[in-house]
Amino acid sequence: MRTERNYVNGRFVAPESDAFIVVSNPATEAPFARVPAATPADALAAVDAAAAAQKAWRTLPSAERAAYLHRFADALTARAPQIGAALAQESGKSVEDASNEAVYAGQITRYHAEWARRIEGEIIPSDTPDENLFLQREPIGVVACLIPFNYPVYTLLRKVAPALIAGNTVVVRPSNHTPVSAFEIAKAVDEAGFPPGVVNILTMDHATAEALCTHPAVGMIALTGSVNAGRKVLDYCKANIAKPSLELGGKTPAIIEPDADLERAAAALVASKTTHCGQLCTAIERVYVHDSVHDRFVALLKDKMAAVRSGDRAQDATRMGPLVSAAARAHIHGMVERAVAAGATLETGGTIPDGPGFFYPATLLTNCRQDMEIVQEETFGPVMPVLRYTTLDEAIGFANDHQFGLSSVLYTERYRTAMTVANAIEAGELYVNRTPADPYQGFHAGWKRSGLGGDDGKHGMLEFTQTRLVVMKY
């Protein structure tokens, strides 16, 4: 069994205690690694190291910070096979998908490095003669980055790269479900030659995470996680009025218009719902189909969902992999059972398979209602509830009648329909004739309970800055 060490102040170090967190492969349930259970003292030492390093890091010309990030991206790309192998074991992804995630993480790191010369301020006219107003962009300081289990490599760089180019230093807490890939990333950090303390990576329990996030030197907490995790982070932020950046839950609606290419739409929706067993915050979570094409579209969905086979992707990469844990599977199965009890029709799936691994079949439910739990709450699994509508206004109303507003999808061939939905949908993203993909030059930000702030692009990078107004009298 491999054993990892925390990465703090430029060194791989043993934790203060001899406690470890065991990591298992969700496809086999076999333990394969153990990672340190950092103590509050370990977390505070990491923040102290980051705070000390930030004083010099922030004063480096941004082009020099970019040079570090480019070397980091080179190291990530070179280490993609090792990062991918670790990620495949801890997540149940195929080695190819996991390695591609590492390569993509290198790409987003390069993208943010290229912002070095474009972190711009403003010159604002003054109302007073002989006076100028300068608005400057400055780093926040130490950023605590809390990483989810579903895309732990990409999401780590999605937060760390913009934080670093803006002049911040970081303390990263990976998910305890998928931490081993983070320590492979730590090796890439080391190979890139960052100054000690600029990047720190530690695994820990919730109590230690609280000590990390409430340290007075932490100026920002960046989380991708559940709504409940977001509420907890807001509590942490209260201690020192730290800035929150929260990418939280989603319940992506897909609206299928009568003129849509039904075959194309069905294939895309099933791929979205079964990629990584539906464990994506932007996966299709509810489908609204026009009455006139409902039966045809459901038949297409049923055939495609029934054809999806679950299994260990290390043995067969064409299969759908496992959920993250037994608890996640029990939660999802309970939601399906309650939906059927409330009147939904189970078209395919909906049973827990025998044998090892946290697998769950692609599951299609029809005759669902807007008030059902399966429509109102995030499943985060391969379950697709389908509802009918008769008018576009009704479909938009259903889509917007929700606590979440992260992403949304529309299939139509009519420009007027697309623009009507684009101007009315209550979500941070709308994808027309495709499913969500989060381009890193865009801005991934949710409405309502889906979050505060956002990731990606110019606006995602600026999340990691604060402003200073200089009023210059001459």
At which residue positions do the language-model features occur?
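Residue-level signal for inorganic ion chemistry
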Residues: 29, 65, 87, 109, ...
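Rossmann-like NAD(P) dinucleotide-binding subdomain of oxidoreductase/dehydrogenase enzymes
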Residues: 77, 121-264, 389
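Structural signal for hydrophobic packing residues in well-ordered secondary-structure cores
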Residues: 51-54, 58, 73-80, 84, ...
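Short, well-ordered beta-strand elements within core beta-sheets of diverse protein domains
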Residues: 31-38, 53-59, 145, 254-257, ...
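Conserved C-terminal structural/oligomerization subdomain of aldehyde/semialdehyde dehydrogenase
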Residues: 26-34, 218, 255, 309, ...
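ALDH superfamily catalytic-core signature
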Residues: 228-369, 432
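Glycine-rich loop-to-alpha-helix module at the N-terminal edge of alpha/beta enzyme cores
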Residues: 30-119
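Hydrophobic face of amphipathic alpha-helices that form TPR/SEL1-like repeat modules
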Residues: 1-27
